[in-house]
């Protein structure tokens, strides 16, 4: 079976690192638990220029490599790969962050996972034709049985996958969001995500045996 996994704030603790950068750059002290919006410009009350500076700093290779792993992520993902499932990392990171992103995965024992970069949020200014880039249209043509996302802005994308259960990793910026439908389920940690996946896998197997 095929599994889609978002990168930031699902596999690694991106927002927590950005709160640190905002403090260092602008002396803006917003605790992680108070990051109420996926849009960090809004969460940190930044000007356009400040936001650009924040995003640039957050995607410097040495900073990307410093992001902490979300507890339990690599262990659970590797268990799924060992069970024979196809697992893909699908990220909305800037296309030019491929090398450090690939290295981060490799250093956290996720070297077996392919990673695809998709312009999920309309941030890319130029079309880039690399083997690791996908257009939204190409993404929508793919099939996934299970997806893990945290960003409300990305929910519309995973809705294109037919019969796909979506685990929403519980984060401050999605706590007040109304989910699109019953296929979206809030999970507090990777253990809950695994339980949801096992239920989905069992359902899929039972459905195929009918």
What kind of region is each of these model predictions?
Residues 28-32, 87, 112, 146:
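Residue-level detector of short coil/turn "hinge" positions at structural boundaries
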Residues 24, 82-83, 107, 160:
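Secondary-structure boundary motif
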Residues 43-60, 114:
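Short, basic/glycine-rich phosphate-binding loops at helix/coil junctions
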Residues 61-89, 93-101:
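Short, acidic loop-to-helix structural element flanking the phosphoryl-transfer center
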Residues 1-50:
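Active-site neighborhood of HAD-like aspartate-dependent phosphohydrolases
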Residues 21-22, 79, 104, 138:
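Residues within well-ordered alpha helices
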Residues 97-210:
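C-terminal cap/substrate-recognition subdomain and adjoining C-terminal extension
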